[in-house]
Regions:
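Surface-exposed loop/turn positions within WD40 beta-propeller blades
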Residues: 85-86, 195, 203-204, 213, ...
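Surface-exposed ligand/attachment interfaces on beta-rich extracellular proteins
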Residues: 62-66, 100-104, 218-227, 270-273
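Carboxylate/His-rich catalytic cores and anion/metal-binding grooves
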Residues: 225-257
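Beta-sheet repeat architectures centered on beta-propellers
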Residues: 1-93, 177-194, 303, 312-327, ...
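Hydrophobic or amphipathic alpha-helical targeting/insertion segments
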Residues: 186-220
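Small/polar beta-strand repeat architecture
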Residues: 95-109, 115-185
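Surface-exposed extracellular loop regions of Gram-negative outer-membrane beta-barrel proteins
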Residues: 285-310
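A short beta-strand motif characteristic of beta-propeller blades
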Residues: 55-63, 172-178, 215-221, 262-269, ...
């Protein structure tokens, strides 16, 4: 007979991610039944995700209606290309390196210090938050870089204080127009002749190519006008997805995206299904269809060879195809799949990597009008977003998938509704952009809110019975191990008996981050009145010993985030309890 007077400890790490396909008896303690706006952390635990903020203070100009959404975004040649309505624009963005006070005088001789002046013209206008500045020169010879000859309060704006790291952006410059009825832009960056270029297709008009000076040239061949997909493979440009020939892939001669002379190496390939995406991976071009996947290998038109990967399952949407964790990930009819697993196992369910969150995909695949995806390389993270017409951004859902040593872990996103996306890595900096329905370009992984809207993080543990659901546990305390990055606005809730409404429901307990370890080079000076006191030698992953009330046959832990604090990681919990009577 156990000694019920002794306190029993039960500790677990936060690992395994969101699991919705197992009973409470089979779930591991570290797995979650709710994991919303938290992400499986590559450093262990569950991290409250970053927000996003405007990457440009200026709205992308509309063609005819304010309801026009962003239908294309890409980073190229130190600028961002944005597509809205019938036009394409570019602009430059950076961050403020040194704060500007409201009283600082700038009347033609001011200086603004920024992280980089790359992509900006040598003179022009800038916008920082709501204030417009003009400048007459730039300097990259100093660090931080500088805008010189600055005048503030331009265009009747008012001088204001601007903190470091806020966005500094140029106005938008039109670089192409007349793209009537453009639907959705997809692009490919390439270099065939020593000049970096980018090509766009929009499902309706002729493909357009920009060089690094942003000169626009339309591809003249009518056979590829209206293409939906484009990919560069073995120095040929491949086009597919025309509404009139949805099963055909057309490719150019080598090193020329606008020459389709068959005798010089151009040609076409027809498959027996509607094409939904193209993606180059290693030494092959993968052609995704509604119900098939094909693999093209070879180097020229004389030895190109097509082979089926599977003839029983396809890709629902080409915008979900991403190179991720050493494989190609795509959305199949039964959830997320990898090409390697699908090729090896065929169309069986074993090829699906998202079984743990299958119910989320089942609920969203059927009625989502559009899908978007991004890869965040430094987090080994794939994100897919389910966009539904008429649905508010605040309730738009998505899923994060993180590759860990033990396998894939998942969580749910709520509050991001992208209409176009791009991920670009430059000098180790991962730039994750998306366009929205309001005409703005946003940068993910920046800030603590969704462009001013709170990031509401939610965590719920599995139902913890400690091996025996028949014995009552009298809870004494919960020890929380977490890693804060700044002040925390979150609370712990303890619930009992599978959250039965008749069981004890103690009031919420606030998480305390008042004494966080100071890290040289990253911590700011703190004050006795501040929300966070950085303590030299203090713990960077503190243990909070929280006495709790109540008892039950099983215990549930919840963390509810207030929405505007900096991210933090939940690392693990220890629950201490005494045994009571058997039911």
């Amino acid at each position: 007979v156990p000694d019920s007077s002794q306190t029993q400890p039960a500790a677990f790490n936060c690992e395994g991610g969101l699991v919705l396909n197992r009973s409470s008896f089979l779930m591991k303690p570290g797995e979650a039944l709710v994991l919303e706006n938290f992400e499986p952390d590559v450093e262990g635990g569950y991290r409250r995700m970053n927000g996003y903020r405007k990457y440009f203070n200026h709205i992308v100009p509309q063609t005819s209606s304010a309801s026009e959404r962003i239908i294309g975004v890409a980073n190229f040649a130190n600028k961002v290309i944005a597509c809205r309505g019938e036009k394409i624009y570019n602009g430059a963005s950076t961050e403020l390196a040194t704060a500007i006070t409201a009283s600082e005088t700038m009347s033609g001789s001011g200086i603004i210090k920024v992280d980089s002046i790359s992509g900006f013209t040598t003179s022009g206008t800038l916008q920082i938050e709501s204030e417009i500045f003009t400048y007459t020169g730039v300097s990259s010879a100093v660090n931080p870089n500088e805008f010189t000859g600055v005048t503030r309060e331009a265009s009747s704006t008012t001088a204001a204080a601007h903190l470091g790291n806020v966005v500094v952006s140029s106005s938008w410059t039109e670089i192409d127009t007349g793209r009537t009825s453009a639907s959705k832009y997809r692009f490919e960056r390439f270099n065939y002749n020593g000049t970096d270029k980018i090509i766009f297709v929009d499902e309706v008009n002729a493909p357009v190519v920009f060089d690094s000076s942003f000169n626009a040239v339309d591809v003249s061949e009518s056979a590829v006008a209206g293409s939906k997909f484009v990919a560069s493979f073995k120095d040929h440009m491949f086009y597919a997805g025309k509404s009139s020939t949805p099963e055909e892939v057309v490719f150019s001669i080598p090193f020329d995206e606008d020459d389709f002379t068959s005798g010089n190496g151009a040609g076409s390939i027809r498959v027996d299904d509607t094409i939904t995406g193209l993606k180059v991976f290693r030494d092959a071009l993968f052609i995704f269809c509604e119900n098939r996947i094909f693999k093209l290998t070879g180097n020229t038109s004389s030895d190109f060879a097509m082979a089926p990967v599977t003839r029983s399952i396809g890709c629902l949407n080409g915008d979900t195809i991403q190179e991720f964790a050493g494989d190609l990930v795509f959305l199949g009819p039964d959830g997320l799949r990898t090409v390697a697993a699908t090729a090896k196992i065929g169309d069986t369910e074993l090829g699906t990597i998202s079984k743990n969150v299958q119910s989320i995909f089942d609920a969203n695949i059927r009625d989502s009008a559009k899908f978007e995806s991004v890869v965040i390389a430094d987090k080994t993270q794939y994100r897919i977003f389910f966009t539904k017409d008429g649905q508010a951004e605040g309730i738009t859902r998505g899923v994060t998938c993180v590759m860990k040593a033990e396998g894939y872990e998942f969580s749910e996103i709520r509050g991001i509704k992208p209409t176009a996306t791009d991920t670009f890595v430059s000098a180790g900096d991962v730039l994750v952009l998306h366009g929205d329905n309001n005409g703005f370009i946003q940068r993910q992984e920046k800030g603590n809110t969704f462009d001013g809207t709170p990031v509401l993080g939610k965590y719920r543990s599995s139902d913890l019975s400690f091996g025996d659901t028949g014995i009552r546990k009298h809870m004494q305390r919960v020890i929380i191990n977490y890693k804060p990055e700044s002040a925390i606005d979150a609370e712990l809730l303890v619930r009992y008996d599978n959250e039965n409404s008749d069981s004890t429901r103690p009031a919420a307990y606030a998480l305390d981050s008042s004494e966080v370890a100071a890290q040289f080079g990253s911590a700011l000076f703190s004050t006795t009145s501040g929300a966070v006191r950085f303590v030299f030698g203090g713990p960077s992953q503190p243990l909070v010993r929280q006495p709790v009330e109540g008892s039950g046959f099983s215990v549930v832990l919840r963390i509810n985030d207030g929405g505007e604090s900096a991210p933090y990681s939940l690392k693990g919990f220890q629950l201490e309890y005494q045994l009571g009577a058997r039911r």
